[in-house]
C-alpha cells in the first residue's frame, strides 16, 4: 500500500470516528442526559401523541439497535480486513454524513426549529437511500458485513422512512393545521399510502431488503397500536397503519423474488439510456453482445461493402476486376492473324 493510499484510508477512518462521536453528543441531548428529551422539545410537537402518524413511545427503542450497529461499524472500520474494502470506500463517507445529520437533527429540535428539522431529516433519508443503493451494487458481503453494515443501515433507512412522515406532520401541526378531525385522518391515510409506495420502490431498487422492510414495518405497527390504544385515538388510521405494514411486507417479498439479472438490466437501462443505442452500451444491433477478444471485428468499423481497389502500378498484368482472366478465344478458321501478332502459343513466363 502506497503512503498516499494509506493516508486516504486513515483520513476516512478518522472522519467516520469523528462523526460517530458527534452523533453520541447529539444523542445525549436527545435523550435528555444533557438537554431536553425529543418528546418534550419543539413545544411537544414531536411527542407520541402530537399527531395521528406519531408512533407509540415503544417504537423508539429501535434506536438502541441502530446505535449499537453504528458503534460496531465505527470500530470495525479500524480493523485491517475491513478498512479498505471496495464497499467501505464507497459508503464510509455517506455513513459518516448520516451520523452527522442524525446529531444535527437532535440539536435543531432542541432549539425548536421544527421547520429546519424537516430539511435535515429529508437529507438524512436521501443519504441513507444512496448508501443502501451503493451497498447493493457491490459484491455479496460476508455474514459480519451483512449484519453490521447492511443490517444497521437497512434498519436505519426503514425507520427514517416513517420518521420523516411523522416529522412533516409535526411541523404542519406546529404551523396551525389541525391534528384531529376528518381532514387530518384523510391526510394521514394518504401519507401511509405514500409510505407503502416508497417501500415498493425500495423493494424493487434494493431487491427486497428485509432490513429496510423491518424498519418501516416496525414504525407502522406502532403507529397503528398508538392510534388504537392511545390518544389521539383514530380507528381508521390505526387499521390503515396495520394494513400498510402488511403491504410493506408484501411488496418487499415481491421485490425479493425478482432475479438479480433483471435488476441489473434495469440499472443498465438507466445508466446507458442516453448513449444512442437504447441502453445496449457495448452491444450489437438488437442488444446482442459483440464478440470480444483477438480476431473480433472492430465495433467502429463500417459494414458497407468495400469498392474494388485500383490496380497497382508497375510491371506485371493488372488483375481483372471481374475475376480470374478468361481463356483466350482462338480466331475463326481461315482468318489471318493481325499484323505483328505472334502465331506461337503462349509460353509460361520464367520467374
Predicted feature residues:
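Membrane-interface capping segments at transmembrane-helix boundaries
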Residues: 8, 79-80, 134-139, 251-269
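Alpha-helical transmembrane segments of multi-pass integral membrane proteins
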Residues: 18-26, 94-105, 123-131, 149-167, ...
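Short aromatic-rich membrane-water interface segments that cap or initiate transmembrane helices
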Residues: 46-62, 147-156, 176-187
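Membrane-interface transmembrane-helix boundary segments in multi-pass integral membrane proteins
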Residues: 54-59, 179-195, 224-249
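Internal transmembrane alpha-helix with an interfacial aromatic "cap," most often the third helix
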Residues: 68-88, 92, 96-118, 122-145
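Central hydrophobic cores of alpha-helical transmembrane segments
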Residues: 210-221
Amino acid at each position: 500500500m502506497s503512503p498516499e493510499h494509506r493516508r486516504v484510508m486513515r483520513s476516512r477512518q478518522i472522519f467516520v470516528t469523528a462523526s460517530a462521536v458527534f452523533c453520541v453528543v447529539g444523542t445525549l441531548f436527545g435523550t435528555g442526559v444533557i438537554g431536553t428529551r425529543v418528546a418534550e422539545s419543539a413545544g411537544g410537537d414531536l411527542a407520541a401523541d402530537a399527531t395521528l402518524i406519531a408512533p407509540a413511545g415503544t417504537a423508539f427503542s429501535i434506536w438502541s439497535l441502530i446505535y449499537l450497529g453504528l458503534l460496531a461499524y465505527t470500530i470495525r472500520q479500524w480493523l485491517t480486513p475491513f478498512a479498505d474494502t471496495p464497499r467501505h470506500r464507497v459508503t464510509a463517507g455517506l455513513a459518516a454524513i448520516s451520523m452527522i445529520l442524525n446529531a444535527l437533527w437532535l440539536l435543531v429540535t432542541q432549539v425548536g426549529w421544527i421547520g429546519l428539522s424537516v430539511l435535515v431529516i429529508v437529507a438524512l433519508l436521501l443519504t441513507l437511500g444512496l448508501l443502501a443503493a451503493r451497498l447493493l451494487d457491490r459484491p455479496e458481503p460476508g455474514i459480519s458485513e451483512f449484519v453490521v453494515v447492511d443490517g444497521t443501515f437497512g434498519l436505519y433507512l426503514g425507520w427514517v422512512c416513517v420518521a420523516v412522515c411523522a416529522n412533516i406532520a409535526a411541523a404542519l401541526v406546529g404551523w396551525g393545521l389541525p391534528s384531529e378531525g376528518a381532514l387530518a385522518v384523510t391526510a394521514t391515510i394518504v401519507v401511509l399510502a405514500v409510505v407503502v409506495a416508497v417501500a415498493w420502490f425500495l423493494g424493487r431498487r434494493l431487491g427486497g431488503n428485509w432490513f429496510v422492510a423491518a424498519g418501516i414495518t416496525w414504525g407502522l405497527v406502532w403507529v397503528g397500536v398508538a392510534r388504537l390504544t392511545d390518544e389521539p385515538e383514530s380507528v381508521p388510521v390505526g387499521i390503515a397503519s396495520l394494513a400498510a405494514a402488511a403491504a410493506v411486507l408484501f411488496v418487499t417479498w415481491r421485490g425479493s423474488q425478482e432475479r438479480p439479472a433483471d435488476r441489473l438490466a434495469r440499472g443498465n437501462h438507466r445508466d446507458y439510456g442516453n448513449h444512442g443505442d437504447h441502453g445496449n452500451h457495448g452491444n450489437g444491433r438488437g442488444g446482442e453482445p459483440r464478440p470480444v477478444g483477438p480476431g473480433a471485428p472492430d465495433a467502429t468499423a463500417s459494414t458497407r461493402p468495400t469498392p474494388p481497389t485500383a490496380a497497382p502500378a508497375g510491371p506485371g498484368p493488372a488483375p481483372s476486376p471481374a475475376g480470374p482472366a478468361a481463356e483466350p478465344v482462338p480466331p475463326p478458321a481461315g482468318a489471318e492473324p493481325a499484323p505483328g501478332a505472334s502465331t506461337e502459343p503462349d509460353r509460361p513466363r520464367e520467374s
